[in-house]
Amino acid sequence: MRSLFVHAFISICILFIAACPAGNPTPGTVTEADALVETIDAIVMEALEDGPTAAISIAVAQGSEIIVAKGYGYADVENEVPATAHTVYRLGSVTKQFTSVALMRLVETGEISLDDEITRFLPDYSTQGQTVRVHHLLNHTSGIKSYTGLGEEFWGKSRLDLSHDDLVEMIADKPFDFAPGTGYAYNNSGYYLLGMILEEVTGDPYAEHLSETIFEPLGLEATSYCRNEPIIMHRAAGYARREGELVNAEILSMTSPFSAGALCSTVLDLVEWQRALNSNRLVDAATYERMITPETLADGAPLTYGYGLSIGEIEGHAKISHGGGINGFNTTLAYYPDDDVTIVVLANTEGANPDRVERLIARAVLDLPEPEVADLPIPAEEIARNVGTYALGDLLLEVSEDDGRLVMQATDQEAVRLLYQGDHRFIASDDEEISVVFAAEGEVAGQLTVFQGGGVYEAQRIE
């Protein structure tokens, strides 16, 4: 199961390409290099074969040393162009941390305050009497309707070049999901509006501002706003799966993802990006700490999302990460601060699971044991009470029965079998790091809770 919360801006031939020299890993928790690379190769090979997935590029670094950076499979299946560490992929929602950093740099200069109401910068935007502040957009607590959750109203126009006015018009009159600060729902509208705020404050187009203030100073030569029209060297083609075969992904105008998901990059550039964050070359230490420190909701409930970054852990190892999904691509970038380890996994196929690949690599790098997963028979009454549709923001989770087993399918994602662990708890069959717990009360479960990457996400039954 792919990450449930990167879905909105949602590989056959196996070919190993060593794309850059690998340095010697720093001694410590990282296991011996040659054996580690063999293990990583096996992990990615299995992911390619299970797909099909056209290509996966990965990079693993500890501190200033690259342990491995390479590509597997084909960046372009039709022309048999192999993937490498220099292959350029669309990032999807990994873009959000770039937008967050650009915004926080303006906070540091005093041009923006996190407590500013967004109408200070977007006076024509209707907040329907709600008080929406900048920090609400950064951590998905604004309650504004996400445009990628509008169904055909948005997706029917997603091939078209849409102006800011076009897109804002879709959401401006939609009821809020909740009052700002009282709930959490992953939201592309919030990050789109942040891009508009950046443009208003700087006077520059979003793409130009990031290029001049971030990409060029850091030497991120392969990172850019991923428009369809320009020639981008080493750019991967994007694919989808249809009946077990690869097909070209649906066309998406890159005007729509904008500051919520329109960047493209390579695994090597993303390693350098992470190093820049760690070394305070982008924002100072206090600002970065603010970005990775989740706030609480109005009722005191803690979040697991900072500003453009998810905060979690794996077997006690702190983890800062974000995934992305966009037409033809799935991606993830993870950093383990206690171990100074960065892992990047980029894939050019919808339905690929870079989150799981990343976690398997992390377990190998950090020398962690595989989690134990049972597959117990499910009592009939347990099946009956859990079947239904559950909503988490604009994401729908359909739970159904299939030959005595429970299957869950998230919006625009492939169905996955749930393995019963007992006591109303299940684990995703294709990602043991994702567990699902159904409420124990009542004849039918009124909600389910997803535990993923240190995050806790509650979905309410709607039918």
Predicted regions and their residues:
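Active-site phosphate/pyrophosphate-handling residues
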Residues: 98-101, 189-192, 213, 268-271
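Short secondary-structure junction motifs
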Residues: 53-55, 67-69, 109, 113-115, ...
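Active-site-proximal loop and beta-strand segments within enzyme catalytic domains
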Residues: 74-188, 195, 202-204, 229-252
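Active-site-flanking alpha-helical
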Residues: 103, 210, 219
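Bacterial N-terminal signal peptides
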Residues: 7-18
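Catalytic loop of the DD-peptidase/beta-lactamase superfamily, centered on the K-T-G motif
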Residues: 20-70, 199-204, 208-211, 216, ...
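Positively charged n-region of N-terminal signal peptides that target proteins for export
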Residues: 1-6
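Secretory-pathway/luminal and periplasmic proteins that interact with or process carbohydrate-rich
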Residues: 66-69, 125-133, 142-150, 178, ...
